[in-house]
Amino acid sequence: PPRSVEDPAKRLFSGPLDGAGRRSLYLQMSIMDPPRFLVGFNLPDLKLPSGKRDATNVPAQALALLNDPFVHAMAGQWAVRLVQDKGSAPADRLRGMFRSALGRDPDDGELQSWTAAAHSFATQNDLLSDEAAWGAVAHTLFNTKEFIYFR
């Protein structure tokens, strides 16, 4: 809701009022409308107490990371931020992406293959924008084994 004066102390959650761009470890859950994205990641039934979690369904999780609109939106937002920095070379963008997503720099082989993939995404189709190409790269990085699993 619009407010004439923004007072963070009067709000339940900090961040923008529309909820965009906020990182969170805690989510407000509604019993009647649980987050659909987290259901694939073994979200417990909010209507029942659960002492033990069920086994996870890894194929459903992989499909959620590939197809969920939330994941596509996050990849698109990351691409917009990357493209706004017009002076950076593709290799520099990829190094920054690896640092942000995986906490490390890519090795030479990874940098070469990811640069080739970014170039392939960008040249696949004349209508494909720079943002769409980098969104595809970000989406692919979200689906790497190293991004999904903790060591």
Task: Identify the role of each PLM range.
Residues 1-101, 105, 132, 136, ...:
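An acidic, gly/pro-interrupted, aromatic-rich
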Residues 122-125, 145:
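Structural motif corresponding to the C-terminal cap of alpha-helices
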Residues 126-130:
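Short glycine/proline/serine/threonine-rich loop/turn segments at secondary-structure transition edges
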Residues 112-123:
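Amphipathic alpha-helical segments that form the core helices of the histone-fold
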